[in-house]
Amino acid sequence: MDEFHRYGKEDSSWQQCFLYPLFFQEDLYAISHDHYLDGSSSSEPMEHFSFNDQLSFLTVKRLIGRIREQNHSIGLFVNCDPNPLVDRNKSSYFESVLEGLTLVLEVPFSTRSKYSVQGIKEWKSFRSIHSIFPFLEEKFPHSNYILDTRIPYSIHPEFLVRTFRRWIQDAPSLHPLRSVLYEYRNSPENLQRSIIVAPRVNTRFFLFLWNHYVYECESILVPLLKRSFQSRSSSHGSFPERTLFDRKIKHIIRISHRNSLKSIWSLKDPKIHYVRYGERFIIAIKGTHLLVKKCRYYLPIFRQCYFHLWSEPYRVCSHQLSKNCSSFPGYSLRVRMKPLLVRTKMLGELFITDLITDEFYPIVPIVSIIGLLAREKFCDISGRPISKLAWTSLTDDDILDRFDRIWRNFFHYYSGSFGRDGLYRIKYILSLSCAKTLACKHKSTIRVVRKELGPELFKKSFSKEREFDSPAFSSKAVARSQRERIWHSDIPQINPLANSWQKIQDLKIKNLFDQ
């Protein structure tokens, strides 16, 4: 592998034309087998293999020979495992070949990330969840429409092979990829004619396919949006005179219809911003309703032309920020008008002017949070707390720590929202559910639990939101945080909650489209 990388640095074309011999290197499958064992031991307990069940490189080479046959009607990994009772998804041979295939395909793409695709060099990109909320806070007040959709993850295998073919010149190296993809597509558990490529499939192979697929989508979509709508994606502060300036220039461009007597007035400088989390992405547009309709019509055509995916235009939802709310991710996002008092002194006289500016206004979706807690059996659908029966076998400290961790996750995640008074209802539900769980465990009532354990136990468990603020900020900063937003970007706590909102939103969209 080191020799391959050394030749690849000298000549990048050599790296793309000679990938197929890597499939016959025993070191590659030794590394992939170790990766499979490490991943299995870290996530789920794996059955102990005997000495006869260890990986055989001779068997692996026989598997590669069957891959070269290119017969999709015959299963590639049937009766090739020494233990026929082991399922294909848990087979060490199948996973080792899959890991080796991923390692080989990652070689030509390891250096590609250093170079930007033509057309994205000037596009300001931030690839971290830390940048989502500051991005929304900066760009949303200067936008008036939102397009909400998601990246389709049901892909035909041949399309994925063609996307790799544009980057890899060694055609034989793509035969194993095609065989593995068709193997997944023809599996009994997959009833569709396509395969599912999504970040929630937590394997190295499918994560690599997802990252490559998203890279292809964004590398084509973003430059086209930039050229079509002439967006600059430039950052600018919330200057008060910006609103008045837009009002003055909006009559510069006049578009008249042939069959209509009305005229359409549009802005000369429309702007468009793109942000994605997981499978969902939103496009913030500053422009007219005609521009939004064009973009809604353009996205389905883009999917059909470039990715051969059929999607109806109604799957792209549009919202006007001044009237409707948009959910992303787990927040109810909208823009509200904020009065601003400006004092101007000219020639010894003081003038007071009232200006109206737009302000990013994220709201805590209390109803959705109660629905999430009801699904996890902390309360019923009306928000009435119930005991968590699944936790009654734990110790008292473990029960309190789990409830405390849930509350802190909610508090940290919604630290940047306005109107956090609704979170106290969530705190009440969690605290009372904790008390009922302890009472159910000790076969007593809430009053007896409070009397025996004391109120300090509940106070200690649900008072750490102040402990979070006090070490990092002064008393003045804590008081200022009540009226200003402070984003606590803690990825281990943000990701699970955001993924939960992602699943709920996907379920709502699916139910809406199935009606």
From Swiss-Prot:
Any coiled-coil regions, as ranges: none
GO molecular function: RNA binding
A Pfam family: Intron_maturas2
Entry's Gene Ontology cellular component terms: chloroplast
Keywords, alphabetical: Chloroplast, mRNA processing, Plastid, RNA-binding, tRNA processing
Intracellular or extracellular location(s): Plastid, Chloroplast
DNA-binding keyword on record: no
Entry annotated with the keyword tRNA processing: yes
Any one GO BP annotation for this protein: tRNA processing
Sequence similarity: Belongs to the intron maturase 2 family. MatK subfamily.
Function per UniProt: Usually encoded in the trnK tRNA gene intron. Probably assists in splicing its own and other chloroplast group II introns.
Protein name in the entry: Maturase K
Organism: Cedrus deodara (Deodar cedar)
